[in-house]
Amino acid sequence: MAQTLSFNGRRRVRKFFGKIPEVAEMPNLIEVQKASYDQFLMVEEPKGGRPDEGLQSVFKSVFPITDFSGASMLEFVSYEFEPPKFDVDECRQRDLTYAAPLKVTLRLIVFDIDEDTGAKSIKDIKEQSVYMGDMPLMTNNGTFIVNGTERVIVSQMHRSPGVFFDHDKGKSHSSGKLLFAARVIPYRGSWLDIEFDAKDIVYARIDRRRKIPVTSLLMALGMDGEEILSTFYTKSLYERSGDGWRIPFNAETLKGAKTVTDMIDADTGEVVVEGGKKLTPRLLRQLQDKGLKALKATDEDLYGLFLAEDIVNFQTGEIYLEAGDEIDEKTLPVILKAGFDEIPVLGIDHINVGAYIRNTLSADKNENRQDALFDIYRVMRPGEPPTMDSAEAMFNSLFFDAERYDLSAVGRVKMNMRLDLEVADTVRVLRKDDILAVVKMLVELRDGKGEIDDIDNLGNRRVRSVGELMENQYRLGLLRMERAIKERMSSIEIDTVMPQDLINAKPAAAAVREFFGSSQLSQFMDQVNPLSEITHKRRLSALGPGGLTRERAGFEVRDVHPTHYGRICPIETPEGPNIGLINSLATFARVNKYGFIESPYRRIIDGKVTTDVLYLSAMEEAKYYVAQANAELDAEGSFIEEFVVCRHAGEVMLAPRDNINLMDVSPKQLVSVAAALIPFLENDDANRALMGSNMQRQAVPLLRAEAPFVGTGMEPVVARDSGAAIGARRGGVVDQVDATRIVIRATEDLDPSKSGVDIYRLMKFQRSNQNTCVNQRPLVTVGDFVNKGDILADGPSTDLGDLALGRNVLVAFMPWNGYNYEDSILLSERIVADDVFTSIHIEEFEVMARDTKLGPEEITRDIPNVSEEALKNLDEAGIVYIGAEVQPGDILVGKITPKGESPMTPEEKLLRAIFGEKASDVRDTSMRMPPGTYGTVVEVRVFNRHGVEKDERAMAIEREEIERLAKDRDDEQAILDRNVYGRLIEMLRGQVALAGPKNFKKGTELSNAVVSEYPRSQWWMFAVEDEKVQGELEALRGQYDESKSHLEQRFMDKVEKVQRGDEMPPGVMKMVKVFVAVKRKIQPGDKMAGRHGNKGVVSRIVPVEDMPFLEDGTHVDIVLNPLGVPSRMNVGQILETHLGWACAGMGRQIGELIEAYKANGNIEPLRKTIDMVVGDGPKSDDVHNYDDASVLRLADQWKRGVSIATPVFDGAGEADVNEMLAMAGLKETGQSTLYDGRTGEQFDRQVTVGYIYMLKLNHLVDDKIHARSIGPYSLVTQQPLGGKAQFGGQRFGEMEVWALEAYGAAYTLQEMLTVKSDDVAGRTKVYEAIVRGDDTFEAGIPESFNVLVKEMRSLGLSVELENSKVDDLQAAGQLPDAAE
């Protein structure tokens, strides 16, 4: 069979161990950010206008704005964005914000108001487009650029609006009684709490203020006492018959009761149930079936019941008893005397129905609506006298005014679900019925019906993403603006103004700026490597404005909840105070329009698992039985086992296969991206997996990235979605490649209006937020065909489009002379020599020349008192050359600052007079390299203020930039020409020409030869007979001219931007930024880790020949302590080691077969081996059909080690590992004989040797080591500052003092506490003594002692230091002198 498939070698092929086919595509990993913000901005207006959400809804909710008199109104018409002034790269370089100007069209309507009738008529309408500030745009990678730095807006988890029922778990009251409470939480507005107290009275609180009886709230809603009782209780009529009463028989209320006396049928007089019997449901049913209607009761049986209606004398209107009054010995005779023989009674039995609302009503002091409203007014605004109008207005504004109160669509949906209402989700305020339903449900809970809510359920927590956070912020800004507009509309002559004059957009712009600049949720992007970027964008934080605080959050909120499954990762969360408050979205999860997290499931129809995928939120999932992704299926897609493990309502259970309605999509749907990158995650302890996920985010991009032998199949997804590796936007042919850009001639999606050329700019040695190096390298060569989505270039930490955070190294698990005690790591010198763990870090230094009071600072080479040697790296302008190697103390930018005039001595005056003034009045403030940093200058940027003359260096940089832009333009022009003229000649070929250039014969049939006789620019002169073709020619011409002018225009704009001066902070004339690349080799003290939470510090780097070696003489690269495995239970690292060993063994075999093929030209053995390795899993590449060149490319990729993927929870088992080892011809134990490199002796026991993937973390000893002799002191205590950033000292703390005390080292101790710390006079003396060469000094009083004395005085204690006494005693010889 002919092998036809071609493989270009530009992606990594892996052998897949996964057995479960994935039916759903993993959603784009940064979709959370992009979709949310796009929905908010809605830059392109859809057909039919923008829907009422995002920015549109903000404007709609604030406008129209009417002035106080109602004589004019400002309406919102529409908004649009202009293109941003600077693109993403320019913003990064110039420290600007990437934003687009927002233009809003407003309409001002002026009315004429008839003074007599008050009727309005429109007098004037003016419409105008108004600039409303800049709106930050999101880059393609889901970040924002604010003042030149990349930031991420983290999504926030908060409690969903709606109604929640809960109890205090018996904590409030000593009896341990459960006090139930309900809380209505709106999206914005006042909270309403309804709660029981220990006496079972129901109270309401508004905004957590003083409580009022709930009946007052109901009265304020317009109900009276009788109506309240009839709403909450049923009524039954007791009729007088003879000397007793006839009471209706109700089986429901009697359930479970015990009879005290005999039950007698009121109609027949027979005893139906004897006294002292329990009324079982069965017995009651029998009585009902017999036709029992009513029972006989005595007067005593009525005592303790409550009246349902007022008992009124209708003639006189006298009220004998009110509704809710209790019937007892005193009241019953009153009723009988008044001649009532029918009594309406409330259906309260104290068992199924409690008298809570009735008791509340009787305890409530307010009698009517007015009292209730006044009471509420006093609670909300204490100290103000209420009037009926103000009280009514205040009460209405609390819950029933859409301006002040908003449940939001989510809140309304949740409320409908919880209270079984059916209200449209456009009703965003509370209604009377809602409040009644809440109180009813609460009373039912107290009566033992229904369940309380679990607030940690993901159905009750929702996510606010960027768009929504931004919307709230912008709304605040507009509301601030609204007040100003109203005032201005009232104070200004409205007939003469335009909308522009009324609006000051500052508050809105300030709100946006404040949100991006200083909100807790707007964070500096974690940019150590591509994984940390993606994780940061998928983070969910419970902190932030309107969220929890670390201190308040209890254990429950932080804990893993069953609803997290497939929505929030149970593994990835920080260690420390934020644990459980900051989470990560699971791989397949997405956020729905209401902000709830959804997870995908496969539908099961008639017992067969379909590929139909359904996204469900936690609330919707509760009613289903969900099987796991690894449940065994037969060929038809039915479950093999009779009982299947499944999840239902938060429990894991075995259920019959017919009950199961859904199945998970993939085994990795429950973990986050970082956790899904850990192979053999299922064999690691959860705590270590957590460390593993967190440490992968800190892996520094290495000089040479290398993809792991043992991956999980998630690597390409992360590399692609993070934007580190560049994917092709559309298919085409590579036209040009160099280190800085790739030019592709498109062959698909050829839209006439768009350019037919895609230029991809590569980032070269840029600095990331964490000072790591961002560098992209092209993978394609000229002439390659690419398809949409193909990887064109590798970025930091990517290798052939796979995420590559570390390196594969040969590991041995064994002790080695104690150098791997306590998780230390022993390395071979080969690792340093071959730059295995070398990384590049880029430091940015900036210097500003300001205009000071004494004159301007100057950036110059002419610095006083500095030798020529120190200036050797500076150019004429005083700025360091690119490529200069710099070390601590070297000058990067020379700068001088004017010094204050000091009075001159006569000698100075004489010298001045003779030599003219110079050097004396300036001081050297040059920027120098900080201590401990060595590197190479890779880039210099010079920024000048408008109108400041540019120096030579700035001009040179500008020239280079313009040349680069011109080259881009010329290349694009060339490709455009080639493309267009190619199409033109295709169109002309075979046509009959009617006209042409000079000397052309009409009627000639055109061919390539004929056309080529003329220069290209004259080809447009040909006109052809065929009208259709002629039309196409003209269209092509128009399009070509338009593209050309567009290209030129773009070039001119960019040149203009380059030449224009820069925006500078006030007082700054010039700014220089110098970027220095620092090469960091691995060294003792650096922190390293594997992917399984196995972290350690490099303790020693040993010569290669001293490292243990294998029988074939290969030395291991790294030695780890075997004791790090058992107690930590992260066995995944051992399995990874074995599998890596097998991969390397297979790679060796493939390498030998390549050599054999080169010798004999027979490719079959190679093809067979590769075929055998890849196997035929559901995700395997079709290697079988590769052509010979492709097989060789793949073999070349695999000769160092075969790449495999073992997905989480669906990876290689023990049998697979053994099979791989056998295939590689290695021992199935995975252990080898090792020899000691120093003595050459064999070690007694076999040692586990293999390849493990190690990462170098961003905790490098070079950044941490620090020393100080003199430096800054704290202002108050006069002690040295702390920390490397402040150039501080080392803290000699309490315990260290004890140590010196224990040694009896009195003088050392005295020195530590005085002259080396805060004895101000003493330390100056010591300095002077050292300078003189003396070694005598005296310690004085530490400043902190004085601080203590002052603090005690501030407490009102008179503390005196009686120093004189000590001196006197010493003088009198009663105290010994200090020892010499």
Curated annotation (Swiss-Prot):
Q: Which GO terms describe its biological process?
A: DNA-templated transcription
GO cellular component terms given for this protein: DNA-directed RNA polymerase complex
EC number, UniProt record: 2.7.7.6
Which reaction(s) are listed as its catalytic activity?
A: RNA(n) + a ribonucleoside 5'-triphosphate = RNA(n+1) + diphosphate
Alphabetical UniProt keywords: DNA-directed RNA polymerase, Nucleotidyltransferase, Transcription, Transferase
What molecular functions are annotated in GO for this chain?
DNA binding; DNA-directed RNA polymerase activity; ribonucleoside binding
Statement: the UniProt record of this protein carries the keyword Nucleotidyltransferase:
yes
Q: Which InterPro entries match?
A: DNA-dir_RNA_pol_bsu_ext_1_sf, DNA-dir_RNA_pol_bsu_external_1, DNA-dir_RNA_pol_su2, DNA-dir_RNAP_su2_dom, DNA-dir_RNAP_su2_hyb_sf, RNA_pol_bsu_bac, RNA_pol_bsu_CS, RNA_pol_bsu_protrusion
The protein's superkingdom reads Bacteria
Entry similarity comment: Belongs to the RNA polymerase beta chain family.
Q: How does it assemble?
A: The RNAP catalytic core consists of 2 alpha, 1 beta, 1 beta' and 1 omega subunit. When a sigma factor is associated with the core the holoenzyme is formed, which can initiate transcription.
Entry function: DNA-dependent RNA polymerase catalyzes the transcription of DNA into RNA using the four ribonucleoside triphosphates as substrates.
The name this protein carries in UniProt is DNA-directed RNA polymerase subunit beta
State the organism named in the record: Rhizobium rhizogenes (strain K84 / ATCC BAA-868) (Agrobacterium radiobacter)
Q: What is the lineage of its organism?
A: Bacteria, Pseudomonadati, Pseudomonadota, Alphaproteobacteria, Hyphomicrobiales
Protein encoded by which gene? rpoB
